[in-house]
Amino acid sequence: MSEWETKIEAIANSTIPVNVTSLSGVPSWMLVLIKRILEKTGKQTLEEVWPNLEVFFHGGVAFTPYREQYKQVIHSPKMHYVETYNASEGYFGTQNDLSDPSMLLMIDYGIFYEFVPLEEVDEENPHAYCLEEVELNKNYAMVISTSCGLWRYMIGDTVKFTSKNPYKFVITGRTKHFINAFGEELIVDNAEKGLAKACAETGAQICEYSAAPVFMDEHAKCRHQWLIESVSYTHLRAHET
């Protein structure tokens, strides 16, 4: 089905009466489906529809900005959230410990990995490091060569290793989605952690956000300008300087 609304209706109608125990998908789009299912059933939480639901395997976008919204529609204490890292180019990682947000790198799936330091991505001849050469807590752009024919292909994501035995990592952003206009090196991971803290302080639920640098002129210092779309908030903190 090419029409999104028709697809949502079909999925909702076919799954509401079924014993669903697990979900898999992109957090933003799955949330749209969940809300439609709750609308159609008149239920307040998803476990009222699917009492045996216990896990959501998610990927595609960061889950952090959506976590609070999921808590609003799924109250079950047995619900688990497992991050996966897959793309059309391959399957690269999965969270193997619910107490650790890092993902285990899939090293036996016919993929040869190389890693380019984020600060070298735009250079003409960046240095690519093999897996055993990576450093912990450093941002790298991931480069892959696969048995399917991809050769030193930069997939556009940035990762940071948290362990080398075994190799575990977190996704920190995209090679093109960062701001470094003034040497600040703001990446998606930093931004989303900051937004999550702001949400916790204000009770806000965020839908989307965007940020851009504003350069210094005779009237103001260099800075960032943020546009944040919020579903709701319970209170706002007083402006602090």
Positions of PLM-derived features:
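Active-site glycine/GP-rich loop and adjacent strand/helix microenvironment
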Residues: 1-237
